[in-house]
Amino acid sequence: MLIIAGTLTACGDNKAVTPLASVSLLPEYQDRLDIYKTVTLSADLSQLSTNQKKMLSLLIEASDIIDDLFWQQAFGQDKTSFLASINDDKVREFARINYGPWDRLNGDKAFLTNTTAKSPGAQFYPADMSKAEFEKATFDDKNGLYSLVMRNENGELSTIAFSEAYSDEINRIAVILEKAATFADNKEFANYLNIRATALRNDDFQASDLAWMDMKNNPIDIVIGPIETYEDQLFGYRAGFESYVLIKDMSWSEKLSKYADFLPELQRGLPVSEKYKAEIPGSDADLNAYDVIYYAGHSNAGGKTIAINLPNDEQVQLEKGTRRLQLKNAMRAKFDAIMTPIAETLIVPEQRKNVTFTAFFANTMFHEVAHGLGIKNTINDKGTVRQSLKEHASALEEGKADVLGLYMIRQLLAKNVISEGTLEDYYTTFLTGIFRSVRFGASSAHGKANMVRFNYFAEHGAFSRDEQGLYSVNVDKMTIAIDSLSELILMLQGNGDYDGVDKLVAKNGVINPNLAKDLASLEAAKIPVDITFKQGKKVLGLN
């Protein structure tokens, strides 16, 4: 937290905020202010009815409140006062992108004066709580997704549900969702909005997740609520608020629908012993492409998501599967602004042609599909994989999704189910994608997963680096490395092997000197690290 913070109540209610003294950029951060390229999030809404446009406007209003909630979870200060304390426009925008004074793509290092280190537990836990104290304590909803940990009047650890801690904001969001439902032409979508509103009020999201899985034909969609646990870097238990407002691309979605049918067969063929692949993925899963028109909260903080795989609820996944949403317009923006120039800088000339948008789209898509494969519950009664691996669960799951995604592409290419591109395209584009993603920093779940995979592949000769710092992919060795790393990760997950994962991350989750040098060359070439958005009702022409 900022040393100069105003007074706040324990549950994030910022009614007693005092003005903040002005802060300024640390000198060493001057060169990082331009690492985000601004992209306009627009879409053709001409085919939407008047009611659908009214509904979109309301969904964006609900998302704005979600955005404020995530500021409270991530930073804990009053957003308006904090941003007003920054006089420089570019620095203020950088702080807005990062949802606070810490650089999300540089290990959460502070970039403003008078700023202390970011707590690994963000605002989900008391600032004075140690990890050991938490683990020894006994209290209700200790590992809960949807509650804050705080101290009671006796100084003991206890929890308060999100619906109570943020009651005003939650109720406002719920009312807006219910109003939006009255404008929905699609009955299933109207039902989902109403059930989601109820879920926000009572912190029980399973029924709304099931309702969301039943939606197949609605052209408008929204992902909203406390969903991912990446912001909780202390334990990975508690979920951050986020929202995406989406327009379905019907023609692209039709192309993708066939892949979900292969999930059971691909699960059976995983390169690991039978006991680690006994779970049967839900057969009601679907795969669709969308243009995203609004990001809010966690999804908008720092690096931007370009694909979604939800719900996270293991029971819903086993019963219904998951929905994989490919955010096509955001994906294209990243490919053009970042992937192409990275390939021209770090890939050998003869393989640059293998870096294609088709492969980038597929790698991203099958990463999300692969979240539905593998194992959700340990084989030795340690509970779910997520519970047993604690703060390492997210990083290992991201690594699993990457390597199993490549495994799936290889299998579907061999069956001619995928007819575009070659294995060399997908592998070379994947390697280029590691360079893109690792610039997000090695401290995040995705960053650790990137480094574990990069260093593992390097050890197994999947790619080589020449004296000029240019990389080339060895297709045969990459294939072998993908299968062996897949087996290793699935076994660590199935065994709930926290210590084994800890050792793997400690050994391979680091950036080596050569890679650091290569990443510096991308900075020297002024290639953006990620994108940020010009978005909202005005951009879309909505009232």
Where do the model's predicted regions map?
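N-terminal helix-rich structural modules
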Residues: 19-192
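C-terminal motif of bacterial Sec signal peptides marking the signal peptidase cleavage site
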Residues: 7-10
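Fold-level signature of zinc-dependent metallopeptidase catalytic domains
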Residues: 29-41, 46-55, 140-387, 391-395, ...
